[in-house]
UniProtKB/Swiss-Prot annotation:
It is a multi-pass membrane protein. This is Heme A synthase COX15. It is an enzyme of class 1 (oxidoreductase). The gene is COX15. It comes from Saccharomyces cerevisiae (strain ATCC 204508 / S288c). Its main location: mitochondrion.
Length: 486
């Protein structure tokens, strides 16, 4: 009966699977009643299938109808795919890290970081609860070098302000730990994350724990009189340790955000293989290779510029020269200022260069200005280059680059105003937030130009990716075919 009318057979084969098509044609031969077709389809368990399916060219030896269910038809995809909720959680947690970086900057600007002289990760969660406890805490602070040399004039009420600034900063850090660790364990145990993502989460958890130790290591450098004497410094934290603390926070932020964006992108690809394969072709284009390298370079420049800003904050170098574009009356400070022998600790002066580059406030400010100029011109040059190559650059990546151009312009303006207005707390804090915003835009841009992971790519290209119809339409077409004479 099948070969009696091949034209009708071809129409039916385009809409039914190998099994359902054979059963349906037998039913058509026996009866033209659509209820019989429904019974046969119900036996093959396709009646209840309401998801979209792909139409493939007809072949008597191959299926024309194949549902896509990751957990059954493609177990490899199940192992590679991570839940969207994991991505949203990671991006949300990265937002908390962004907030604590800004709060840490405020703690530094208000000189509150050394107000808590002990590190108690668990018992230090609660602040002093009564007058007696406050007085005991104040006595501990009075024994610190900062109080003896800088803050001997403050009273208990003033101490409470700087104490709460540091306490909130530490409490926020503990909250991030809980918000990250507990859901990470849940997602891993419930198998909502792939092995690839589990490795990332494990690394981020270790980095988060390290950040807590680095924070106390930094604070201790401002409480130890011997270290202050060795640095010939006033009671303040080491600029090296401050920058390390800042850099660790930046790495933690980047790791969370990058992983979250990657998960969202891969979920989108699995949902729409057609669009994914089209994007793969663009990303495989050799013409986009230079832009991919440029995106990584911009990410590195943004990070290094922010770290040089950390050195400026650690040395209070923002107050050295408060003019722009010149530094004082010159375009550049004198060589004697830049390479001051007073910063050497060796008799042979072999540490002259690196000591001044990292410890001389004048030189450190010049380095930060130079990094800022490099960052701005690099983004500007990349933006101009991308406009010429916009035909080969994905639209979302081009949008991210436009945003980056705006952010770097705003950040440069904030930096100039911060210097001219003698580093007011409000401007300096916004400037620090701008550094992280610039890093964010460069990271998003780089992630959008990144090629897909090979395992995920291999899964995507095997998914059904032609035109789609629904099972309801299949039944409708089968009914029409059944009513036609054979």
């Amino acid at each position: 009966m099948l070969f009696r009318n091949i034209e009708v057979g071809r129409q039916a084969a385009k809409l039914l699977t190998r099994t359902s098509s054979r059963l349906a044609w037998q039913s058509i031969g026996a009866s033209r009643n659509i209820s019989t077709i429904r019974q046969q389809i119900r036996k093959t368990q396709l009646y209840n299938f309401k998801k979209t399916v792909s139409i493939r060219p007809f072949s008597l030896s191959s299926p024309v109808f194949k549902p896509h269910v990751a957990s059954e038809s493609n177990p490899i995809e199940s192992r590679l795919k991570t839940s969207k909720n994991v991505a949203y959680w990671l991006i949300g947690t990265s937002g908390l890290v962004f907030g604590i970086v800004v709060l840490g900057g405020l703690t530094r600007l208000t000189e509150s970081g050394l107000s808590i002289t002990e590190w108690k990760p668990v018992t230090g969660t609660l602040p002093p609860m009564n007058q007696k406890e406050w007085e005991e805490e104040f006595i501990k602070y009075k024994e610190s070098p900062e109080f003896k040399l800088l803050n001997s004039h403050i009273d208990l009420d003033e101490f409470k302000f700087i104490f709460f600034m540091e306490w909130i900063h530490r409490l926020w850090g503990r909250a991030i730990g809980a918000v990250f660790i507990l859901p990470a364990v849940y997602f891993a145990v419930s198998k909502k994350t792939s092995g690839h993502v589990n490795k990332r989460l494990f690394g981020l958890a270790g980095l988060l724990g390290l950040q807590g130790f680095v924070g106390w290591w930094m604070v201790k450098s401002g409480l130890d009189q011997e270290q202050l004497d060795a640095r010939k410094s006033k009671p303040t934290v080491s600029q090296y340790r401050l920058t390390t603390h800042l850099g660790t926070a930046f790495f933690l932020y980047m790791g969370m955000l990058w992983t979250g964006l990657e998960i969202l992108r891969e979920c989108k690809w699995i949902k729409n293989p057609v669009q994914a394969i089209s994007l793969f072709k663009k990303l495989d284009n050799p013409a986009i290779g230079p832009m991919r390298k440029i995106s990584l370079a911009l990410l590195a420049v943004s990070f290094l510029t922010a770290m040089s800003g950390g050195m400026v904050a650690g040395l209070d170098a923002g107050w050295v020269y408060n003019t722009w574009p010149k530094m004082g009356e010159r375009w550049f400070p004198s060589s004697r200022e830049l390479m001051d022998e007073n910063f050497c600790r060796r008799e042979d002066k072999k540490d002259l260069w690196w000591r001044n580059l990292l410890e001389n406030p004048v030189t450190v400010q010049l380095v930060h200005r130079t990094c800022a100029y490099v960052a701005f011109t690099s983004v500007l040059a990349a933006h101009m280059y991308a406009i010429k190559k916009k035909a080969v650059i994905p639209r979302n990546a081009m949008t991210s680059l436009h945003v980056m151009m705006g952010v770097v312009t705003l950040q440069a303006t904030l930096g100039i105003l911060t210097i001219l207005y003698l580093v007011p707390i409000s401007l300096a804090s916004i400037h620090q937030a701008g550094a992280l915003a610039l890093l964010t835009s460069s990271l998003v841009f780089a992630s959008q130009l990144r090629k897909p992971r090979a395992p995920m790519r291999n899964v995507i290209i095997t998914l059904p990716h032609s035109s789609k119809v629904t099972s309801g339409k299949i039944l409708s077409e089968a009914s029409k075919l059944a009513s036609k004479p054979l």
